[in-house]
Every structure is written in structure tokens, then in C-alpha cells.
């Protein structure tokens, strides 16, 4: 399973004018600057990181788990990425039978396959990874990035894949992406000192550092692998860490950061297989952030305890739910239609999509 988790200041100020939020921490302009890999970042302010325990969560319950068959879709490999937008569930996965990554479009609420975009990669030995990138542009469902060559397409509202050139990004392999608007891209930038969250202007290639992630000494960007959730309404981002027992919340411009640290501050070693994994995914609607917490040394351990954690966008703990141990619930999505129903993907089942009903304390 893959964990995927991913302007000029004047443009950002215009974009963010009037947005609400949390908050925790300070606005960007009030923070000292640090530098990583020649990019300036406003450092995390004092008090932005707080220590908490899992026992601080109110305990919630799983009321029901219902499997949802998808008509016309058969997936034999669990390397799945997905994005819910408007009336569609967009699914990307590596299809061994066809030797390429495929993008499927499933209509909601009838869960019927209505389009398939393919292929990305020639196969059988060349599998071009593609990334589904959300956008708030009303004439598009999402962007689709070919990670091998940087070519960018968008998926139109009439379900066509339209080329739109190359994406502007720094040279060091960002692997989490979020379009804020037509010309603005939030992404991540690896360096030997850590990972930085940056904003890239697609018109003039201006790079602005938003947040530095470097809370373990002498650790490169790989060990800060994150999952990325967002709310366009709140203008907020949430990130959960694979190799660190912590989760963070901040504005689209990096302002008002709040990080919650549950576990140890440092890694066990600089060899990733020897480090426990914690957060495998986070996702959100406009009201809440959900994170899948599965502490283990290997993500194939089926008997590990798995929990779903729920937060509000200010980073306050809402509830923690215990999920079945023998299931492969690693990711999911939430809609604004209900605050008690979410959708989880089981990576161990062919019929992978499940509707989960929650009971908050």
C-alpha cells in the first residue's frame, strides 16, 4: 500500500482575505524565518506543538459497516488512490492486467462505473504513477498528474481528460499536491534537513515556503511522509505523519499552525522499515478531519489494532473509534451530507468500499 498521503505573499494575502479558522499558533508575518534547501520558511511559533495522549480522546463507537458494490468495476490490485468530488468518486489504481495506471470515474449515489481513463504507462515494466489533484475550479473535476514526466491533465465535467501542459514545481520530487486555485499549487519539497510545505505560482514559478517540517534532527524529507486533507470552505489543511505519531492543522497560507504530538519526538533509526508506522491516511469534509491510525512495523500485519480518529478543524479531539482488527481500512473519504457517515476503503477486499456509521460520545 502506498501512503500518499502533499505565490507570492501578496497573492496569498488576497486569496486568504476574509477566511476564518483556528486557530493555534500565529499568523505567518509574525514568525521568524528559517531556511531549508535555499527556501525560506516561517518557523513554527512557540506553543504551536502540544503534547497529548490517546486517552484524551472521547470514545466513540462504530454502529455499522456496510459493503458497497461498484457496478462495472473490478480491481485486482490494492494500490488505490481516490477522490470524491461533486457527484463522482474518482479512483486511480495500478492495473496489472493492463500494465498501467488507470483512472476510473464512478457516479454517485448509484455507484456505477461511468468512465475509464487509460493508460498511463506502457507496461508491463513501466508503470507511470499518476496523482489525483483536487481543485476548486468549477469547470474541472480534478487534475491528473503523470509523475514520470510532469505532464498535467484535467478531468472535465463531461468526463474528458484534457492535456494542459507541464506543472511548475521545484526540482526535488514533491509527491503531495493540492491546487488552491487556477494558478496556485500547494505541495511539498524534500531536503536533507527535512520536508517543507510550499506554495508554487503556476504563472511565474514563484516558490513561497509555508511550513518547515524538521522536528527530528538530521532527518531528510522521506521520513516526513504525510497524508494531506483539506477544506476549501475552511481554507485549512490537515496533515498526518506515517513515521511520527503526530498530526497538524494550518491555514492555506501556513498561518495559525497547530500540531498535536502523541508519541516519541524522534525516529527509532534512519532505516524506514525499522520505524513503526502510525498514520496511514487522513481525509476530511468541511466539518471534521478523520485519520486512520494503525501502529505497526509493517502495513501488511492484518491483526493490528486500527483506530479512526476524529478532529475538528481547530485541531480539537472529537472522538476515537476502534475499527475491526482483521480489516484493511487504510483510507477513506467523507462528505458534507452527513457527519455520522463516512466511507472507508478496505485494501484486503475486492469490493473495497464501505459505508461506516459512527456514534460520537
Language-model regions, residue ranges each:
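C-terminal motif of bacterial Sec signal peptides marking the signal peptidase cleavage site
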Residues: 16-18
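Loop/turn-rich, solvent-exposed surfaces of beta-rich toroidal or solenoidal domains
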Residues: 274-311
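Blade-loop segments of beta-propeller domains
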Residues: 112-140, 215-219, 327-329
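A short helix->beta-strand "capping" segment at the edge of beta-propeller domains
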Residues: 46-77
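Structural signature of eukaryotic scaffold interfaces centered on beta-propeller domains
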Residues: 78-85, 130-138, 175-181, 224-234, ...
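Beta-propeller blade signature
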Residues: 103-109, 198-201, 304-316, 355-360
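Conserved blade-ending motifs and adjacent loop-strand segments that build the rim/top face
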Residues: 125, 264-272, 316-337
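Beta-strand-rich domains and repeat architectures in extracellular enzymes and scaffolds
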Residues: 66-101, 290-294
